[in-house]
Amino acid sequence: MTHIVCPHCQAVNRARDERSADKPNCGKCHQPLFDGPVALTAATFDAQVNRGDLPVLVDFWAPWCGPCQMMAPHYEQAAASLEPAVRVAKVDTESEPDLGARYNIRSIPTLALFRNGREVARQAGAMGAGDIVRWVRAQL
C-alpha cells in the first residue's frame, strides 16, 4: 500500500501499488490524485512532502522569471511521465517567500526532490522535459 496525499483536500489516501497507475481519485473529495503539477503553499507544503509515501519534486519559481516561464511547459510534460510514481509540485516564491527562505532558494528555477520529508537532491536552472525526467529517475 502506498499513502498518497490528495492535492485538493490534503487527505491521505491508501492505494494499492498496482492500482496507483489507474488514475485514482481521492476517497474524501473524489478529485483526481494526479493531475499535473500541484501548486503548493505554506499551508499545503508540509502535508505533501511529509505525509505521503511518494517522492515529491518541487519547482521553486517566480512569475517574473523568464527561464521559469520557458521551463513551465517542459515541467508539465515531465509531470505526465513521472506521475504517479512521483508527486510533481510547484512553489511560487513570490507568493510564498517563506518557503523559498526555508529551503535557501538562491536562484530560480530550482528543482528540489524530497523523499520521506527530507530534501535528497537539488538542481538549479531551466531544463527540458527529458532532462527533468532523467535527473529525477537518476536520484531515485
Residue ranges, per PLM feature:
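Short cysteine-rich clusters marking metal-coordination/redox-active sites
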Residues: C6-C9, C26-C29
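Cys/His-rich microdomains that often coordinate metals
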Residues: N13, P32-L33, A72
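Short linker/helix segments within small regulatory modules
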Residues: A15-P24
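Non-catalytic, surface beta->alpha helical segment in thiol-disulfide oxidoreductase systems
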Residues: D17, S107, A112-L140
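Short Cys/His-rich micro-motifs in 6-15 aa windows
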Residues: C29-V38
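A short beta-strand-turn-helix
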Residues: V38-V56
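Short pre-active-site segment immediately N-terminal to redox-active cysteine/selenocysteine motifs
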Residues: D53, F60-W64, S107
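Typically the conserved alpha-helix immediately C-terminal to a functionally engaged Cys/Sec
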Residues: P67-L82
